[in-house]
């Protein structure tokens, strides 16, 4: 089953945050000491336009390189800029599959979807 994760809008995605942002602290939890210099951010799955907004926002905070690290395990693609995910029961769509099987399936999905318009995928980092 496929799910649309977000709309392709020129805004920051929901839950966008950086380690420099202010947030509530709980005195019973460890401190955030050192995190404000770590220069990391996170968000929900961005659309293609939202990814551009993230890059623009982060560019105001650093002159160095910006790396996208994709930690999602389920297969996900951009279709006309809209992020979509393939998932199964309990979000276990890829459970039990080899890495190569998943990569081959993702390539097949992208090729099939690409016949109907532009599609893009995030490349999994290892």
PLM regions: where:
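Cys-dependent protein tyrosine phosphatase-like superfamily
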Residues: 1-126
């Amino acid at each position: 089953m496929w799910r649309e994760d977000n709309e392709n809008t020129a805004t920051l995605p929901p839950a966008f945050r950086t380690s420099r942002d202010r947030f509530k602290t709980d005195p019973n939890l460890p401190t955030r000491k050192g995190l404000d210099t770590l220069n990391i951010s996170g968000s929900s799955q961005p659309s293609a336009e939202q990814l551009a907004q993230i890059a623009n926002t982060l560019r105001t905070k650093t002159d160095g390189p910006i790396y996208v690290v994709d930690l999602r395990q389920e297969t996900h693609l951009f279709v006309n800029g809209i992020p979509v995910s393939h998932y199964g029961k309990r979000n276990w769509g890829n459970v039990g599959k080899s890495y190569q099987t998943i990569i081959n399936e993702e390539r097949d999905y992208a090729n099939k979807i690409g016949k109907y318009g532009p599609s893009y995928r995030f490349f999994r980092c290892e």
